[in-house]
């Protein structure tokens, strides 16, 4: 991050008698020659290259811990502050002293489980954690799923030696993989259906989509509402209900659908740590796991992040769209590349707003509820129930009962006295 604080941390290194310790237990090495002597026997991060890591802007501060001088010498500016000997149990105190708001970027060379377990509390909002190494972790580590979702914390990685391979558009992506396999966990609700609609209408989207949904009402609606569109686009669509299958059978069905290569994209809509943890083993070597479910900050998931650097996988999240993103969505709607109306499940007037909020919390409808403030009095009504509540509006619904511009115009004409062109 430009003008941010970058921390580069490696595995443990031996101390020397001539080094001095500060109040945090950090070892300050007075010279490059001394540092080379201290690390000549054991340099876990030896051989890595900086590459184009700083091509997009310089951090205002760079801190290094347990990193060989040969790597530090690749930085020309700003000067690297060396603080060796910081153990994971002191990371929080170290971050408070060096980056009170958290580190904007952390590069971990040859990561260990102990190092990664200690990282969540020291990350700034929007932090990027770049893992670089060739040895698997051997066990899951702590990942703050809530901060990945709400604070846009990202985990990327590479085997090396060029650590910049983790960055940029070629190093990590922000879009569904064309022609790949995608898995939407919790795909029967409003947000899941929007993800599904978008993937099915993408010009170059996935060729195979698996949807998991445990709601007995929503589950069959997925196939009914999206099956025809998937067939039209030549996309394989399958729906599983984990509550209707023994755990081992469900896992086997997921594995059978994904095949040997794994899922290129896994989007976890449900706010459930177990769903995130169980999804990780099904991720392709260079796949992307997106945490979309609204888990609170501090909610820890246990994930084996070895695949992040050994296979170039990504862990990312989103809590919603920026204004710019919303503009991009509208552009797709205007050129008929995205049918947002298909997500509408119920409508109501302004007096139904409270009922709509309660319906949202109760999961009453599988799709979105639209409240029209210019309509003073109309109860929250499922589109299917417009047959009796507003027959002339119902008659203008689209295929499979989808909301349409014509139906909206008739609704406003009848109940708001508004002519909508």
Which residues are covered by each model-predicted region?
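C-terminal hydrophobic helical "lid"/dimerization subdomain
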Residues: 1, 18-57, 66, 70-78, ...
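Glycine/serine-rich phosphate-binding loop and adjoining beta1-alpha1 elements at the start
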Residues: 1-3, 8, 124-180
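A short helix->loop->beta-strand "cap" motif at the edges of active sites that frequently abuts
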Residues: 4, 58-60, 124-128, 151-153, ...
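Residues in the short beta-alpha loop(s) of Rossmann-like NAD(P)-binding domains
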Residues: 12, 65-68, 135, 212-217, ...
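Short beta-strand "acidic-cap" motif of Rossmann-like dinucleotide-binding folds
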Residues: 61-64, 131, 208-212, 291
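Conserved beta-strand segments of alpha/beta enzyme cores
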Residues: 81, 154, 208, 236-238, ...
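ADP-ribose/adenylate-binding Rossmann-like module
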Residues: 105-110, 123-140, 265-270, 281-300, ...
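Rossmann-fold NAD(P)-binding glycine/threonine-rich loop
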Residues: 117, 133-152, 277, 293-312
